[in-house]
Every structure is written in C-alpha cells, then in structure tokens.
Amino acid sequence: YFQHWLDMEDKIKNLPKIFNVNWFRLDDNGKFIWPGFGDNFRVLQWILKRCNGEVDAVESPIGYLPHPEDICLDGLDDFTTEDVADLLSVDIDVWEEEIADIEEHYKKFDRLPQELTDQLAAMKERFAKLK
C-alpha cells in the first residue's frame, strides 16, 4: 500500500501538495490553541496561497511552516500573531517522542518501503542538529 503511493511520483506529472495540520494543539492550560471550526478556512487560505506561490514559508525540521503574519486573523479579536507563532512552534522533545512512536509503529510492517524509514531517519537527524 505504501509503495503504491510512493510510486505515484513516476506516474503523475504534477503531484499534489501535501500539508499537515494539527487543529488540536493544547496550550499550557489544556485549552485548544486554534479557535477551530469556521476559522479553519484561515489555514486553508494560507495553503492555497502557498500552492499559488503567493506566500513564502519557514523551513523547519518537520517541513515548511507559515510565517505567523501570513495567517489572516481579521475578525479574531482574541487571537494574535503571537498566538499563531506559539501554535507553529516546534517542540523538540515532543517531536523526538513522536519519532520514537513512529519507529515502533514501523516495526509492525514486514514490507515497509525503505523510503519511509529514510525520511524518518532524516527528520531525526534534523532534530539532532538542533541540540
């Protein structure tokens, strides 16, 4: 199954862009950081702008992230660019735990494509360079 999707690179001229969103990050008080629901369009708006080359991104160990000021906050009185920056922060310890969990998950597969383990190893290395 994994290999089928990896092989698409050779079969499709214009591959789709892939984005990952965690709508459920919590702050130090256990509350959701992102307002959610109807405000999700703000992130989707950034994704469309990114795909159209209208906005840039910041490189991180987990991929490219929006500049906080590129997320439209019009009409959100209780949500600031600083809140967006907090939401976009990459917690090294959390991600190292995530990588360890993924490594354990990968052990369940007997025919896992090498490309997946290579990508995970590369991400692990990017985090190691930050320490």
Which sequence ranges carry the predicted segments?
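Flexible, glycine-rich loop/tail regions that form catalytic "lids" or insertion modules at the edges
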Residues: 1-131
